[in-house]
Amino acid sequence: MDALLAELDPDIEWRPHLSALGGRSIRGHAEVRDYLASLEEEWEDFRQEVERLFDAGDEVVVFLNTYSRGRASGIELQPRVAHVLRFRDGKCVKCVTYLDRADALRAVGLR
């Protein structure tokens, strides 16, 4: 987790998909750490693979294939999500997650 946090601006704004956290954003390293720790509590074998990147000027769209299994239920999920990332001074300052990849492309004017 420390390697990820090193790539994020200390004041990062991270907006998980709307159904997570009641649609609210999280801010800063401490909240990101808490959010990711809560995912680890609920999900095992969690991993993401980059499928494709799109240059959108000040932003980058990342298509990800995500894999996880519920710790209590054993249910496996494989959502194909997108992140829209904004960078400043080499650090990610904003991350917005989309469950619909077309929505991510529309958000940056690529569709």
Segments from the language model and where they lie:
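C-terminal and inter-domain tail/linker signature
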Residues: M1-R111
